[in-house]
Amino acid sequence: MLDSVFEIANARLYRCQVYRYFSGLSRLYLSVFKPKQTAPAFYLLFSDVAYFEGPVNWQSVDFYIGASEDCLDLLLQTGIIGPAVLQFPDAYATITDTARLYLVDTPNSQIRIIASSAARLDTVPANI
């Protein structure tokens, strides 16, 4: 079993929704809802986001970290980085040290986010 990033009990019962994305800061905020609730229970913040793949709403907040090789493959496949980076071990190491592939499996698809970090927030700043 893979380790859950946020360690939320009954994580598959929660619903996620994209709340805001700030391209200048590369920050992605997600609203997380308990079953049958219309107000968010909490938020998730992904920082230094390079990639997001998924619908704007989905079931499950059971995020886990994918393999660093899968993260690098996705960065190469999408053209975010070029294959030349593989010729420079220091650059390759920096990417694999800072970029993480966050995954969540839903009943219908797999959500993929490449970011440097993720945090759970009780509230979000009022000015966003």
Please state what every model-predicted region is.
Residues M1-I128:
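Surface-exposed, interaction-prone regions used to assemble/regulate multi-protein complexes
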